[in-house]
Amino acid sequence: MNRQLRFAVAGPEILAAVVSGCSSGNKSAPSSSASSSSTSPSASSGGAAGTKVIIDGKDQNVSGSVVCTNAGGTVNIAIGGAATGIAAVLSDGNPPQVKSVGLGNVNGVTLGYTSGTGQGNASAEKNGNSYKITGTATGVDMANPLQPVNKPFEIDVTCNS
């Protein structure tokens, strides 16, 4: 239960960090780092149209923008707004490896996946600038914290280049 409780507490923080970090494309702060990694945000002009998020067989009807950022060998994908957004962090390979997914609150349960925790699973496919991320997210229902919640999910999203 300790691992599940840590995930339930860390899940919203991961989601908020990814969504807010990926949606700050309008800020222009100079970088004093000599890092060779590049950051290239890409916001979809049509919002989340064409983006599909399905959790436990139900379309989540996401709205808002899609923001993708490549940095340090990862692709950060944020869909929707900071409060209700969906976020994913993938490796920049092909096929990409899923590092984390934050699905937000679904029916009172904060759902997500983080690689290496032994909870849930996720895989991704890349086709050009489009990603399909599938797996099983986990969460804790505080009404019954000893029973973990597992929900299948699918995310189809296109990042503009």
From Swiss-Prot:
Major location (coarse): membrane
Covalent lipidation (S-diacylglycerol cysteine), chain numbering: C22
Family under the similarity heading: Belongs to the mycobacterial 19 kDa antigen family.
Lipidation, N-palmitoyl cysteine type: C22
Membrane topology note: Lipid-anchor
GO cellular component, one term: plasma membrane
InterPro entries with a match to the protein in the record: LpqH
Domain notes: Forms a U-shaped beta-half-barrel with a large hydrophobic cavity.
Function text: Might be involved in ligand transport. A host TLR2 agonist, modifies host gene expression in response to pathogen.
Record has Lipoprotein as a keyword: yes
Species of origin: Mycobacterium avium
Keywords on record: Cell membrane, Lipoprotein, Membrane, Palmitate, Signal, Transport, Virulence
Localization terms from the record: Cell membrane
Signal peptide location: 1-21
Regions of compositional bias (Low complexity) in chain numbering: 21-46
Post-translational modification: Modified by Lgt on Cys-22 with an S-linked diacylglycerol with a mixture of C16, C18 and C19 fatty acids, signal peptide is removed by LspA, modifed by Lnt with an amide-linked mixture of C16 and C19 fatty acids.
Segments for region (Disordered): 21-49
Protein name: Lipoprotein LpqH
